[in-house]
A protein has these predicted regions:
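Histidine-centered active-site/metal-ligand motif
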Residues: 117, 251, 362
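Secretory targeting and sorting signals
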Residues: 1-25
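Conserved active-site-adjacent core of cysteine acyl-enzyme catalytic domains
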Residues: 93, 277-427
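Beta-strand-rich ligand- or partner-binding modules
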Residues: 24-227, 376
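Tryptophan-centered motif/residue detector
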Residues: 10-11, 109, 132-135, 229, ...
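Active-site-adjacent structural segments surrounding the nucleophilic cysteine of cysteine proteases
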Residues: 185-302, 371, 427-428
């Protein structure tokens, strides 16, 4: 998958490059991950109600009807058209204040969207000069594309910030607080409702990463290899051009498909798509093609939208977040807990021994560590065959390909109730 790296985006916006800030005492860069309680007392609702801890549309008090134009109607002759009149309800969080100024934020959500429904997630940052910026749309999402084309939203940039695919970046001023808003939509006249069960966000400031890596391992002599099923993205080259043509463009859905299948095999619960669901795919490993279509961002024209991949995994019955880790030391507890991680990386000039020569943006699965922690065991979908997918990468080289490229972005996918290490709440 080709997507702009953090360094490219920050430079293009005229912001400080990673590592260009004055040297600081060695400490991890600040980040904050938060899961929002949908029943929080400081949140507000309009046209929505809580049922079993999840958010649905209420029976009355809905907003609308409002018109929506699906700019991707009948995309590639698929016959789908989300245009029409919609009723809606909203949930708005209270203010989340942070102990640091952040310059990027990624939200993620878990939702069910029956036919004719979809959800929109927005963020409103408060900048360090005290003023509140506008609401930025982070995604318009439905699990199916049969009657709505899920999409990121371009052209939102202003003096305060911009959204690149799925990530809010601030400009001249960092943000010190933010609010999230989720809007649930259904076609006017329908009784169907989306169900939002989880909403989270990770905010960070990556202008100085000194102290984050290289990291010291916590491994104590016994290696861990979770044995995630290996899928190659390359065997799908040329498949379904309307979903970005397979091959190098499908690293994210291939990685997501690997982890979903891992949980299917580990828990003996069928999270993966069934043969009936992927009957339209005439190729080997059809679950990869199915996933690529199910995460495809019709505005971005790609399958690498981070929250869309997490939302897809959640739509299969799992719990999923997009978050950030400072280094592999923080990844090790997840591996020991049996939880593989999908990581966003980039490198050039053969800087990762055993990997492809270079990539502007790539996703792969962290599935283990050697006993001394010097090697990270990875399922790298950028391999010619499934059998060649497992790789052993140097720890320090991997961190250098991961942290500067994405700030340690991972998809954290696991079953409901699975024992999960604590995520970084605040490290400033």
């Amino acid at each position: 998958m080709i997507r702009h790296t953090l360094l490219t985006l920050v430079a293009a916006a005229g912001l400080a490059l990673v590592g260009s800030a004055p040297a600081l005492a060695a400490q991890p860069y600040p980040l904050n991950f938060k899961t929002f309680a949908l029943n929080a007392s400081d949140s507000t609702r309009s046209g929505t109600t809580l049922s079993g801890g999840s958010l649905t549309l209420a029976s009355s008090g809905l907003g609308g009807p409002s018109a929506y134009v699906d700019t991707f109607a009948n995309y590639s002759g698929d016959g789908a058209d989300g245009s029409g009149s919609y009723d809606s309800g909203t949930w708005t969080s209270g203010v989340t204040g942070l102990g640091f100024g952040f310059n990027e934020l990624v939200a993620s959500w878990n939702a069910k969207t029956p036919s004719g429904t979809w959800v929109q997630v927005e963020v409103q940052p408060q900048l360090d000069d005290g003023h509140w910026a506008k609401w930025y749309i982070l995604g318009q999402w439905s699990s199916s594309d049969s009657d709505f084309h899920r999409t990121s939203v371009g052209g939102q940039g202003d003096a305060d910030g911009f959204v690149s695919i799925d990530t809010l970046f601030t400009k001249d001023h960092p943000a010190v607080a933010y609010r999230l808003r989720a809007t649930l939509y259904r076609r006017s006249g329908s009784t169907a409702t989306p169900t939002l069960s989880r909403l989270s966000a990770v905010a960070s400031n990556l202008t100085n990463q000194k102290g984050s890596f290289p990291s010291q391992t916590t491994m104590t002599g016994t290696g861990v290899d979770l044995g995630v099923p290996p899928y190659s993205q390359e065997i799908h080259h040329g498949e379904f051009p309307q979903y970005d043509n397979g091959g190098e463009a499908w690293c994210s859905p291939t990685s997501t498909a690997m982890v979903v299948e891992y949980w299917t095999r580990t828990t003996h619960t069928n999270y993966s798509p069934t043969p009936a669901e992927y009957a339209w795919v005439p190729y080997p490993d059809p679950q990869v093609d199915f996933t690529a279509r199910a995460v495809y961002d019709y505005h971005y024209n790609g399958a690498g939208n981070w929250p869309f991949n997490a939302a897809y995994a959640a739509s299969r019955g799992l719990v999923a977040d997009v978050t950030q880790l400072h280094n592999l030391r923080e990844a090790e507890p997840f591996i020991r807990a049996g939880i593989p991680l999908v990581a966003s990386v980039a490198w050039n000039s053969n800087k990762l021994d055993g990997g492809i020569k270079s990539t502007n943006g790539h996703l792969l699965v962290i599935e283990g560590f050697s006993g001394d922690g010097s090697k990270v065991i990875v399922n790298d979908p950028a391999s010619d065959t499934n059998g060649q997918v497992p790789h052993l990468y140097d720890r320090t080289q991997f961190e250098r390909a991961w942290i500067p490229a994405s700030g340690g972005i991972v998809y954290l996918i696991r079953p409901t109730g699975w024992p999960t290490p604590s995520l970084t709440a605040n490290n400033s």
